[in-house]
Amino acid sequence: MTKLNRSLRTALAAAVVAIWPLAGQAWEPTRNIEFIIPAGTGGGADQMARAIQAIVAKHNLAKVAILPINKSGGAGAEGFLDVKGSPGEPHKIIITLSNLFTTPLATNTPFNWRDLTPVQMLALDNFVLWVQADAPYKTAKDYVAAAKAAGPGKFRMAGTGAKQEDQIITVAIEQATGAQFTYIPFKGGGAVAVQLVGGHVNSTVNNPIEAVAHWRGGKLKPLCVFELKRMPYTAKVTDKMSWADIPTCKESGLDIDYLMLRGIFMPAGVSQEHVDYYIGLFAKIFETPEWKDLMERGAFNQTRLKGKEYAAWVAKEEARHVSLMKAAGFIAK
């Protein structure tokens, strides 16, 4: 073998060794990740997305930054259409709430969850019936009785968006009890809670994380939670009560339950390798103390799903929302 051939073989071997690790590496983002929030600032989706951003940055869980972007227009349609219009783009994710189902049903906006790629269920979010702390009602039954006695439309219920989850629950209360509320929509749960604190409305069905600061501050009080069982968190939020002390609405004579998805989707057309990266990222996030604190602070139902199980759950939940929306008269014609 000539000296030239030996040199050539050595160079080729070195090139193979240099390239081989790259060929075996899993995909990672090469630029910042857009994190679309199809809701306003201050609400539950916004708070969770920004908590995820902070956790990833604090623990150096990604080599790029996560950039939360609120796109709440059209009851979240703006955000969903943005992701739908980015097929194959792995640097874009979206956090979902029930407007994943309600917005296309109520507005005929041309998108469906099947236009996206399911990645990870983060948790399920509770809804709580809230009133002002100094309101005379001790139970949900007391409150509903007062609303009925006041007459149709006299009591005002604030909620996020029109024909979305908060109004679905409001209509369910009306149908179950005969009470009639004036429903007033706002862009996000943070604004909804502020309206109740200010006395501009009589009640809300805010998610726990949207109202907990006002509860702890002595401005609001919870009457019941719209879940089949009590929340498991026993640490005191106020000097007298924990999340676990809040009765279910069914216990209080209001036989209604509703949980909301907090989940992650990507655009259609991404690869399994792209999906796996985010599943791995969220697995790391779930182990951080900040995430565990968020789960307790927001009294989340810590159900997590991914892959086929997640997609099957979403399909079943879509069918349930079709039924709920029909019952409420919210399906667009």
Predicted regions and their residues:
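C-terminal lobe and pocket-closing loops
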Residues: 124, 138, 212-287, 316-319
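N-terminal (or domain-start) structured segment
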Residues: 26-115, 154, 175-207, 214, ...
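N-terminal signal peptide c-region/cleavage motif recognized by signal peptidases
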Residues: 19-23
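Short, surface-exposed alpha-helical segments at coil->helix boundaries
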Residues: 46-50, 54, 167, 171, ...
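An extracytoplasmic/periplasmic, membrane-proximal ligand-sensing/linker region
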Residues: 30-32, 179, 272-333
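Cleavable N-terminal signal peptides
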Residues: 13-14, 24
